[in-house]
Amino acid sequence: TKTLNLHCPINGTSYGYVSCNIIKELNKLGYDLRYIPIAQPTPDEHFIADIKSALQRWDYDHDAPSLKIWHQHGLNSFVGRGLKIGMPIFELEKFNAVEVHSLNNPDELFVCSNWAKEVIQSEIPKRANNVRVVHLGFDEEIFKPIDLPSSETTIFANFGKFEVRKGHDILPLIFNKAFERHDNVTLIMMPTNFFLNQEETNTWVNKYKNTKLGHKIQFIDRVPDQKLLYQIMSQVHCGIFPSRAEGWNLEALELLACGRHLIITDCTAHTEFCNSENSNLIKMNSGYESAIDKKFFDGSFEWRKISQDEIDQAVEYLRSIHRKHQSGDLSLNNAGVETSKNFTWKNTVNMVDKNIEEMT
């Protein structure tokens, strides 16, 4: 049996969801997992059976390797004397001094995309030989290809918490520019952000509702489990993600796995699985701008800029998907389904296992 100390959160955040899937698959490989919590574990119900054994093992192994799945600024503390592996998920292409110091602490780093690996190699050259790509995944038991909805309305959707980084300030402009009141279209939004208060959330919602097509935009609460998310995704024709910076983009991959179409920016981590065969790529021609949203990013660094050029590309893609659906020519995104087969959680954990074996 291989023993691994696992230091990660178990909750409803992206980090928590990634951690639960990795624990579940490591168990299947017969790992003896010792769990060191980050914050109070609050697992989704359908994960409890799979991760219960790990949660009960507080007695970390002093000599086993430790894998910590956490932010780039939080890789300073590990348990035991074994190999220390940090697995951060980051969105920007530069690090501050605190992050560099933290990223220099683990013996090895796992990052989830080749884009992220290049960022580490360029920003922290002395780590160049200690960084490996371990992509994230999707749940193939849940997100299966399913026929596109037969509704006359063309249904677009965006998943991901309200943030400037994710292009939520630009999306209402794009949607309103693409269509008129008489167009048979809907935009579904699932943007719950636990870090925002009610007033901040209302300000975001009004950016959408108080527009020409506000009545065609539908907000839904974040769903507590993946099966419900799949039901929503199966009612959608196309996802739209005008994101300036992503650390992975779980929902975009899940949409591809369902055979949905994507309109998405051609930058940062989701370039790992989004390409010109399976996605309508928004080429990022406008360079960079200060990464600032007065909430999560203070403008110290930059992210991709979205200007008229990128907006116009997105508008054209939206209209094109709508035209195809209206004329009966929009079929399942088979290229997306094929791509997704390489990105299961099982594959993720096989890469974790193979890399740990090579390193120890």
Summary of predicted features, one role per range:
Residues 4, 149-166, 172-175, 187-189:
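Conserved donor-binding/catalytic core segment of Leloir-type glycosyltransferases
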Residues 5, 40-125, 227-228:
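Extended catalytic core of nucleotide-activated donor transferases of GT-like folds
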Residues 97-98, 137-153:
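Acidic anion/phosphate-binding donor-loop and adjacent secondary structure
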Residues 198-227:
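Nucleotide-activated donor-binding/catalytic signature segment of Leloir-type glycosyltransferases, i.e.
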Residues 230-236:
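Short alpha-helical donor nucleotide-sugar binding micro-motif in glycosyltransferases
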Residues 244:
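Aromatic "clamp/platform" in nucleotide-sugar-dependent glycosyltransferases that forms part
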Residues 261-264, 280-282:
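Short hydrophobic beta-strand element within catalytic cores of glycosyltransferases
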Residues 305-316, 323-354:
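A charged, aromatic-enriched C-terminal amphipathic alpha-helix characteristic of glycosyltransferases
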